[in-house]
């Protein structure tokens, strides 16, 4: 079977003898993708990666069934019908969407690891398209690279300069709002940073 299957539902049996899923039938269902343009890109991505052997069938299945599904839910709410028009702002909004989405399975928000996997699936599809279907993705870079910082990376914290802290302390003497005043005092005692 050298050509891509027709239709929105594909049944592919894992025939890799070294795979733990050898002989398992994977039912890929692309019908949840409302945009025909995005659907065609994702089908190509799955088929080419499967045929070449870049990714295991189970990995591709999980990417399409769980991870990319979340992007399509987001895209439908924002009327995104093409990957070509994606911007860094869309990626930021997608990350915010992932922060606030409740998992249907666990009834809890997605953990940071799950959010990273979902975003990496979108990145993987975009990166693949940059090589194989460059006309279907943005020309400019839409990922900053620090969307989800790894745990082993050096954490850089921007501290507030001493002269600014002195100005804050002077202003606290005359601050009338008790919530603001004591909130800043608590932040200072716990290590206030610029981001706070």
What kind of region is each of these model predictions?
Residues 149-179, 189, 193:
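Long, amphipathic, Lys/Arg-enriched alpha-helical "connector/arm" segment
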Residues 196:
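Acidic donor-binding helix in nucleotide-sugar-dependent glycosyltransferases
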Residues 1-143, 153-154, 167, 171, ...:
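Charge-rich, intrinsically disordered N-terminal extensions
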Residues 144-148:
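Short linear capping/connector segments at secondary-structure termini
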């Amino acid at each position: 079977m050298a050509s891509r299957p027709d239709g929105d539902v594909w049944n592919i049996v894992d025939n890799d003898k070294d795979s733990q899923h050898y002989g398992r039938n994977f039912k890929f269902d692309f019908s949840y993708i409302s945009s025909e343009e995005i659907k065609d890109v994702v089908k190509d991505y799955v088929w080419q990666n499967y045929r070449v052997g870049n990714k295991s069938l189970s990995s591709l299945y999980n990417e399409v069934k769980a991870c990319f599904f979340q992007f399509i839910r987001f895209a439908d709410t924002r009327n995104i019908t093409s990957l070509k028009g994606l911007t860094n702002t869309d990626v930021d909004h997608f990350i915010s969407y992932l922060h606030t989405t409740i998992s249907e399975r666990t009834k809890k928000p997605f953990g940071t690891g799950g959010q990273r996997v979902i975003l990496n699936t979108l990145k993987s599809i975009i990166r693949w398209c940059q090589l194989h279907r460059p006309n279907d993705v943005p020309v400019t870079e839409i990922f900053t690279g620090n969307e989800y910082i790894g745990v082993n990376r050096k954490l850089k914290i921007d501290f507030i300069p001493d002269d600014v802290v002195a100005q804050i302390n002077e202003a606290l003497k005359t601050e009338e709002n008790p919530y603001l005043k004591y909130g800043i005092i608590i932040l200072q005692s716990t290590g206030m940073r610029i981001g706070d």
